[in-house]
Regions:
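Bacterial Sec-dependent N-terminal signal peptides
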Residues: 1-31
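Acidic, glycine-rich segments characteristic of secretory precursors and extracytoplasmic regions
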Residues: 22-65
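Inward-facing hydrophobic residues that define packing positions of alpha-helical scaffold repeats
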Residues: 49, 106-109, 172, 179, ...
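Elongated scaffold/linker segments in the mid-to-C-terminal portions of large proteins
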Residues: 93, 229-356, 360
Length: 394
């Protein structure tokens, strides 16, 4: 019996030594389904891109109605209350959620960027698309951050370190740097549901306008406007078509497809649900006056596509039921629009100013109204007010 215990103790000791000796090896072992970053094939990169697109869907969706909420276009919908819609306090649930989502998505996007930068096959079109998409998405994330919070921590790589907040000017420079890199890698537009050079130009136009670089804002916007791939909607039905599943609208420069089997992102659930409870309804002023005729423009084509007879609903995102302006075959797959042609016209007009931009504004408005009678000249204030009103209507 004593011998039996001695043998057991000896075996246990050997096992302990073996486990200790192999601990470093075990620590370095990857999960069986995980591929080292430097061993990713082009097929792997395509799958990785799909995952990042899904992550960005969640991020853009989280910000999508932020402007309407804070701009008081909305009031509380049935079964919902809005305590302080304009709160920007760090403790705010919405603000905190947006901030956290930005950095969750950034981790995935930085993996794309790191993969491109470490690649030994940078001439591959798939690798270029990976890098260009990563740089564009990173610029888009930081655009959301800087336009709401100013300074932000700049993360060029994934890290768990505490990174201090950089000044706002540095964040803008980082965005411009990433867009410059994306511009050299992205292909021309072929599909509205994939990142292209055109959507990079669109974000560049927005950035330049925000920084009051009006010359380049107009140049970038015009690059998009002059592409035959894009066109302004001229009827209510065409306008509505941009916001339904499988959209073929030429207004769309880039949209996230939102074809998910789990974790559905439902626009109609927020403003136009089938059940009698949803988050937001149009404010009384918004519903009654947003698309009202004025002395210089009448019969806005957007009105029918956005509001119906029920003043508590916004039918811009059709729910697939009755009372909608257009049919939406898959309401759960409404695209998450990132950039549209309309904004490029308004950016170009604003950047050119009242004297040189009036013709661009007229061209835009002629597509949106049955009747337009703008004067031959406008003061800077009058012109800016028209731009602001059109942005509000969009």
């Amino acid at each position: 019996m004593k011998r039996f215990y001695m043998i057991n103790y000896l075996l246990c000791g050997i096992c302990l030594l073996w486990m200790t000796g192999c601990s470093n090896m075990l620590d370095e072992m990857r999960p069986k389904d995980k591929i080292p970053q430097d061993a990713l094939s082009e097929s792997d990169l395509t799958k990785l891109l799909n995952g990042v697109y899904a992550e960005m869907e969640e991020l853009v969706f989280k910000f999508y109605m932020d402007g309407d909420v804070k701009g008081e276009n909305f009031k509380a919908g049935p079964g919902f209350s809005m305590n302080d819609p304009m709160s920007m306090a760090p403790s705010s649930k919405d603000v905190l959620g947006q901030w956290q989502k930005c950095f969750t998505a950034l981790k995935q996007v930085n993996f794309l960027v790191e993969t491109y930068e470490a690649s030994s096959n940078k001439d591959s079109q798939v690798v270029k698309q990976t890098g260009g998409t990563g740089y564009y998405f990173r610029a888009l994330i930081y655009y959301h951050l800087v336009t709401r919070g100013g300074g932000a921590p700049i993360l060029r790589k994934r890290t768990y370190d505490v990174v201090p907040i950089s000044p706002e000017a540095d964040v803008w420079n980082f965005i411009k740097e990433d867009l410059g890199k994306a511009e050299s890698l992205l292909p021309e537009f072929t599909d509205r549901f994939y990142v292209s050079l055109s959507v990079c130009d669109a974000l560049n136009a927005k950035v330049c306008l925000a920084l009051k670089d009006y010359t380049n804002a107009a140049i970038y916007a015009d690059r998009v406007i002059t592409k035959s791939n894009f066109a302004l909607s001229t009827t209510s039905a065409e306008y509505a078509n941009a916001f339904i599943s499988n959209s073929n609208s030429k207004e769309l420069i880039f949209a996230l497809a939102n074809k998910r089997s789990t974790g559905l992102l439902l626009f109609y659930q927020s403003v136009n649900d089938i059940d009698p409870t949803w988050d937001y309804s149009p404010s009384a002023d918004c519903y009654s006056h947003l698309y009202a005729d004025t002395s210089v423009k009448k019969q806005d084509i957007r009105a029918k596509a956005v509001f119906g007879a029920d003043n508590s609903r916004i039918i811009k995102f059709p729910n697939g039921s009755t009372g909608q302006f257009v049919t939406n075959e898959q309401p759960s797959q409404t695209p998450i629009v990132v950039a549209r042609e309309a904004e490029m016209y308004l950016i170009k007009a604003e950047a050119l100013g009242a004297t040189n931009g009036l013709s661009t504004l007229k061209e835009f408005m002629n597509k949106r109204y049955a009747t337009v009678s703008l004067p031959s000249s406008m003061s800077d204030t009058e012109f800016q007010n028209q731009i602001l009103d059109e942005r509000h209507r969009e």
